[in-house]
């Protein structure tokens, strides 16, 4: 079945265009509500959101959909995605919903669904809900329509849970930190967590107006953070994205520390504390070969999945693994969370920094990354990867990289793009291979 509504991370799109309209959101609420109404108890759904202007519209539409099929609704307001996952489980809700388009601009929005266990829904569950969206809803009798209430202590509950991931014996009172919340969901909770743990906190991106989420700020654009770290002589910078499920670190020299380096540090620390189950770390095919080589020297296997934190989490659950993530900054620690949590990941980095008595630049650049180049080629029609000349160029490149690098070529799941990525110790070889394949794809497209 072709998926009309659900993509790689829930439902996402430009606001007021299919599928991100009020009408579709209401029907998603009705379909998901009917699907999760199992058993004879009163059924409850928890709904959180980030700071986009359209969040009000989507929240109201979902609330109408869920209550119309007899589900009670708990509204928690702006809260990071991992906070919604956490509260869904702790409040014994049948379903959790996060209204967010993550790192996308304010004009986009999305709907992410979590099961009662706090994990994102499986593709099978999404398929069942998708099939019901365009069907007549199973409306509740007038006396059975759901109720809605807003709770005020959701942020406090999440703050407490995040702080519990940080060793009780440690404090951050010797650190000056710059924190960029991307004008997003963590704009209140993240500064509170760091302040309560004793840090001096200098904030960026904490004045959301509905339109400025991820706008030249946050983990996808840490340039302002880098500048502020240098200006204030801070010990470290932390950049979250719009829904705070990913994090990028900046050291005291203004250098970026990506998700691969964060995973390397956390995996090393977890291994020492016997928390690295199966001596395995899970990452995607985009993670740098340098990470794989570094972990291998420690006897740690790197298990690679398709791109997307959903695939990382699925592999972690299937193998019972505890540490995983993506180069983009999604870090999943199953002994603390069920989904990526930028703030929890940042606290693990800070714990290591406090205990090491080193500067961030000395601690956080754990391995030397291989030169890596990624380019996108847009195509208009057809299957350019099946073209004979493209296949030949790919075969030649794979032969050139044999034993000394990696080549990854894939079609985008959301746009008509071919993504070409190569990495090797020789940067000239990397550029030569990527440019040649891109040009061959352009001619074939």
From Swiss-Prot:
Protein's recorded name: Phosphoglucosamine mutase
UniProt KW Metal-binding keyword: yes
Entry-annotated residues carrying Phosphoserine: 102
Positions of Mg(2+) binding: 102, 241, 243, 245
EC number of this enzyme: 5.4.2.10
Species of origin: Zymomonas mobilis subsp. mobilis (strain ATCC 31821 / ZM4 / CP4)
The keyword Transport appears for this protein: no
GO cellular component, one term: cytosol
InterPro entries for this protein: A-D-PHexomutase_a/b/a-I, A-D-PHexomutase_a/b/a-I/II/III, A-D-PHexomutase_a/b/a-II, A-D-PHexomutase_a/b/a-III, A-D-PHexomutase_C, A-D-PHexomutase_C_sf, A-D-PHexomutase_CS, Alpha-D-phosphohexomutase_SF
Recorded superkingdom: Bacteria
The record's account of how the chain is modified after translation: Activated by phosphorylation.
Family membership noted in the UniProt record: Belongs to the phosphohexose mutase family.
Molecular function GO labels: magnesium ion binding; phosphoglucosamine mutase activity; phosphomannomutase activity
UniProt remark on cofactor binding: Binds 1 Mg(2+) ion per subunit.
